[in-house]
C-alpha cells in the first residue's frame, strides 16, 4: 500500500511538531555547550565574513545576507528531503536543530540569576550580570532600571530566539528554523 500525498504531508507535519516539542524539552534538559555552541560558531563565521564582504550599500548587504543564509536553507532543505521517508530520523534532526537554535532555557537561567541578585539587593552582581542580557551600560543604572533592562531584553530575546524560531520551524520546517535563527 502506497502512502497518499495527503497522508505524506500529515506524517511530515506530525514529525515536525514532535521534533520541535522534543527540541524544546532537550533545551531544558541538555545544557548548552560551554564552547562551540552552534549559534555562536555561526555568529563568529558571519562576523569574519562581514569584515571582508559587507559594505554600506543595499547591493553588498543583500549579497552578504544571501551568502550567510543560503547555506542554512540548503542544509535544512537537504536534511528535510533526506529524512522525508524516515519519520524517526526527521523527528531527531528537527529536535537537534530546535535544541541548537532555541535558547529559552539559558535565557530563563539568566533571568532567574538576575532576579535573585535584585531580590537580594546585590546591585554589584546585577550590574555584572546585565551585559549577559543587553547592551546597556549597567554602571549608571539603579535597581529599577536594571530590572527594566533585564525584563525588556528577556522579552525581546524570548520573542526572537524562541517564539519566532519555533513559528518559522512550524511553518517552514527545518529550513525555516535555521534561516530564521541565522537571520536573527
Q: What does each model-found stretch correspond to?
A:
Residues 1-183:
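Short amphipathic, positively biased membrane-proximal segments
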Amino acid at each position: 500500500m502506497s502512502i497518499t500525498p495527503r497522508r505524506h504531508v500529515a506524517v511530515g507535519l506530525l514529525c515536525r511538531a514532535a521534533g520541535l516539542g522534543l527540541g524544546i524539552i532537550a533545551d531544558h534538559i541538555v545544557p548548552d555547550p560551554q564552547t562551540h555552541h552552534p549559534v555562536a560558531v555561526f555568529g563568529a563565521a558571519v562576523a569574519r565574513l562581514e569584515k571582508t564582504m559587507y559594505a554600506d550599500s543595499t547591493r553588498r548587504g543583500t549579497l552578504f545576507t544571501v551568502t550567510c543564509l543560503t547555506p542554512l536553507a540548503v542544509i535544512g532543505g537537504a536534511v528535510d528531503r533526506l529524512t522525508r521517508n524516515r519519520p524517526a530520523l526527521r523527528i531527531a534532526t528537527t529536535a537537534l536543530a530546535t535544541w541548537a537554535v532555541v535558547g529559552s532555557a539559558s535565557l530563563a537561567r539568566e533571568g532567574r540569576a538576575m532576579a535573585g541578585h535584585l531580590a537580594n539587593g546585590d546591585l554589584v552582581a546585577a550590574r555584572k550580570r546585565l551585559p549577559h542580557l543587553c547592551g546597556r551600560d549597567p554602571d549608571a543604572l539603579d535597581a529599577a532600571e536594571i530590572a527594566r533592562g533585564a525584563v525588556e531584553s528577556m522579552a525581546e530575546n524570548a520573542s526572537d530566539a524562541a517564539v519566532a524560531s519555533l513559528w518559522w520551524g512550524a511553518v517552514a520546517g527545518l529550513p525555516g528554523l535555521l534561516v530564521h535563527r541565522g537571520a536573527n
